[in-house]
């Protein structure tokens, strides 16, 4: 089961992010899936697509995600990843800078019967803001 769940996670990153196939979101995410991010919770694939995928693909082009490590135990899959992109749209209120951005993150997901039922994402939002030109690191640290 763990290997099949790892395959779901790898497919998620490859198709949803690298190939920009939004149809894969509904295919791999259960209708009642819950997503947890620093900006709140999403409910189901349409909500996740609108609040996460549309926001990121609208703000960044050339998104590429490399999966560096994947660990699975039963229905739990943890993925360590790194992403590169170009800031070409409004991101977190920061106008397009055309700058390259690189972030690291971790995704923890629960996969049941081949579909993602819950997920947690953690990534370097401060680093993203700095790279987009929204603040210098010194400004972020002084707050």
Regions flagged by a language model, labelled:
Residues 5, 20, 26, 37, ...:
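Ligand-binding pocket scaffold of soluble enzyme catalytic domains
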Residues 69, 106-108, 120:
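Short, surface-exposed charged micro-motifs
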Residues 86-112:
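Exposed beta-sheet edge and beta->alpha loop/turn motif
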